[in-house]
């Protein structure tokens, strides 16, 4: 995570230097072109998701299997080959981390709030217990009080 932050800070500094040079040189047309192109690139997003996925799964290595236990057998969610998590799993990974607001999730996943809402609703419809599904997801990986007491 720290490595990722450092890399983005370095990119931001490079961009800031470039903008400073363009402003001093009066190259405002070039700056306007940069603002149209300087959006998050596909490779930046892919790298971000790979780092997020790997970090999250280090914290919660059994997340996918525990998550799927909350879904009907015919509705299991499995990432594609080469993926650690997919969009649905990332949404619920964020929920597990305490981020429940769809707008915040949308910002973090580069999606619209409506897309987040649609995914959440679709996955909730596949749950064994729809009413407590998100509460159960939020508890994935927690030690129960009973387990703690038995190990004491």
Regions found by a protein language model. Give the residues of each.
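Cytosolic nucleotide-binding catalytic cores of signal-transduction proteins
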Residues: 46-152
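Histidine phosphotransfer helical core of two-component systems
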Residues: 13-53, 74-79
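Conserved HAMP-HisKA connector
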Residues: 1-6, 13
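Phosphate/oxyanion-binding loops and surfaces in catalytic or ligand/nucleic-acid-binding neighborhoods
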Residues: 7, 18, 59
